[in-house]
Amino acid sequence: MRFGVVGFKGKMGKVILDVFSNDGHTPILLIDKDEIIEEDFPEVIVDFSTPDALEKTSSYCEKYNSNLVIGTTALTEKHFKILENLSKKVAVVQSYNFSIGINILLELLEKATKMLNDWDCEITEIHHSKKKDKPSGTAILLKNALNREVEIHSLRLGGIPGDHTVLFSNEGELIEIKHRAISRKVFALGALKAAKFILNKKSGFYTFKDIIKEAFI
């Protein structure tokens, strides 16, 4: 697979570049704020950078007819409109979290919330101190899976890649459902699965849920 990385000098970009390359794929488009390395046309472009980069990323996808894997968080309605328009021309996989564990957890929560709908419920999420958006995109995904109004408590500490806990409680019991990312590599491995998933697709908008369904159902 010929691939491109937007934000290749960032922490996540470096991990993506490493994971894809070690799996035998060839980086031929590397984009960052101060440098662009353009060797050939990529089959898939991966962007885990910032919302501000999305318009440029979209233009490269259109230029090369490249499919897109996007894990950027804090997207607005404007950004989703860009992705919607792009998905009419190429295949797009968008998620706020590309770890397999979180996406399985989302499936579990959709079932659990129906059985625990009269229990109190709150979400806590902890990320590294340099993460700007609060709450995290993953916490929003968890809240959406619960399909109810819940408080989200956000902490920014040290270098934690991602720690999410959903708590259910009644007067005598507490259930904690927790996911902890030990390394950023888990997100890059998920992005690789997503890239392989859309490699030969012509167009359409997909989420990581579609990939989980194909893999496990």
From Swiss-Prot:
CDD domains from the entry? DHDPR_N
What positions does the entry give for NAD(+) binding?
G7, F8, K9, G10, K11, M12, G71, T72, T73, S95, Y96, N97, F98
| Reaction(s) this enzyme catalyzes, per UniProt | (S)-2,3,4,5-tetrahydrodipicolinate + NAD(+) + H2O = (2S,4S)-4-hydroxy-2,3,4,5-tetrahydrodipicolinate + NADH + H(+); (S)-2,3,4,5-tetrahydrodipicolinate + NADP(+) + H2O = (2S,4S)-4-hydroxy-2,3,4,5-tetrahydrodipicolinate + NADPH + H(+)
Localization, per the record, is: Cytoplasm
> Which Pfam families does the entry link to?
DapB_C, DapB_N
The family database entries (InterPro entries) matched by this protein are listed as: DapB_C, DapB_N, DapB_N_CS, DHDPR_bac, NAD(P)-bd_dom_sf
| Record keyword Coiled coil present | no
Q: Which EC number(s) does UniProt give?
A: 1.17.1.8
Q: Where is the active site?
A: H127, K131
- Tell me where the transmembrane regions lie: none
- GO biological process terms, semicolon-separated: diaminopimelate biosynthetic process; lysine biosynthetic process via diaminopimelate
Asked if Oxidoreductase is a keyword of the record, the answer is yes
Q: Which Gene3D superfamilies match?
A: NAD(P)-binding Rossmann-like Domain (3.40.50.720)
Instruction: Recall the GO molecular function terms of this protein's record.
Output: 4-hydroxy-tetrahydrodipicolinate reductase; NAD binding; NADP binding; oxidoreductase activity, acting on CH or CH2 groups, NAD or NADP as acceptor
Q: What does this protein do?
A: Catalyzes the conversion of 4-hydroxy-tetrahydrodipicolinate (HTPA) to tetrahydrodipicolinate.
Family under the similarity heading: Belongs to the DapB family.
**Protein's recorded name:** 4-hydroxy-tetrahydrodipicolinate reductase
| Taxon lineage | Bacteria, Thermotogati, Thermotogota, Thermotogae, Thermotogales
